[in-house]
Amino acid sequence: MIVGPVISLLLSYFVLVSGASIEPRAAKSTDQPVDVPYDIDEFTQAASLAQQAYCTKGAHDYGLKIGDSTLLWTTGDGSLKQRVNVHHSESLGIVVAFQGTNSISPFSDFHDIQFRPVDPDARYKQYYPKGTKVMNGFQNAYTDDVDTVFKHVEKFKQEKNETRVTVTGHSLGAAMGLLGSMDIALRMNGGLHKAYLFGLPRVGNPTFANFVDKTIGDKLHWVVNGGDWVPLVPPRPFGYQHPSNYIWIYPSNSDNWRLYPGQENVHGMLTVPQDVGTSDHLGVYFHSKIGGRSGPCPSQLGGF
């Protein structure tokens, strides 16, 4: 979701005002932030794999080591179709990493501006409560890859004698990752181990957000860096809603982070001016740099 910020926001506004609201706006949490109760090293590892999904050079270097992980398989060319990497990690298990927006690909950018709310895809619609809506573009990007990804994840689970499946991604990749996390939890034997999503935009309506909370709960870890504007789109007045419990890094790119309980917490990211560029969206998350196409390739674990 790193198409030129001003262009993206204008297109977002045009698409949204020309359509109907998904459903009335849901409530915001007023709970105070708390210390992050999770293993930070796992965030560092996951962020480095989210960055690697952007990398074209060496994309098929199977056996590539990043931290405690090994690259096993890749699909998608990163332009016409979003890239998805599968790694095996000592700390996270089988890791599915979704590429964020390729800013020089109109096909990738187009996913970010298809804001129309739609029903869940037929593959998994039966598992969702009535009234669930998700953003069309994010779902299209996800369903382009899902069948072959599921097939290979099951294959590598058997080969590695591994039951844990973790999902990571940044920006558009985080949105795909949220849909993927739910899909794995609902349809894959063994379900979801954990999800680490960075710079996550809103993906669905309150019915979706509530079902995410119910289904994967504190297995989901999503992170906002400083004044990043991407987590504020699509806008809430049009019915989109985040799931609970985001982690806010503030100041941006620092090692100061707190967890904000509940959905759409009024504290944290909503209290500071938004960075209209990408310096916070493409930043340092738990010491690993996520810089998109301009980030480290191959990715590096920590060190920032």
From Swiss-Prot:
Catalysis: reaction(s): a monoacylglycerol + H2O = glycerol + a fatty acid + H(+); a diacylglycerol + H2O = a monoacylglycerol + a fatty acid + H(+)
Signal peptide residues on this chain, from the entry's feature table: 1-19
BP terms from Gene Ontology: lipid catabolic process
Disulphide linkage map: 55-297
Subcellular localization, as worded in the UniProt entry: Secreted; Secreted, Cell wall
Catalytic residue list: 171, 228, 281
InterPro entries membership: AB_hydrolase_fold (IPR029058), Fungal_lipase-type (IPR002921), Sec_MonoDiacylglyc_Lipase (IPR051218)
SUPFAM superfamilies for the chain: alpha/beta-Hydrolases (SSF53474)
Top EC class, one word: hydrolase
Keywords assigned by UniProt, alphabetized: Cell wall, Disulfide bond, Glycoprotein, Hydrolase, Lipid degradation, Lipid metabolism, Secreted, Signal, Virulence
Family affiliation: Belongs to the AB hydrolase superfamily. Lipase family. Class 3 subfamily.
Protein name: Secreted mono- and diacylglycerol lipase MDL3
Organism: Malassezia globosa (strain ATCC MYA-4612 / CBS 7966) (Dandruff-associated fungus)
Record gene name: MDL3
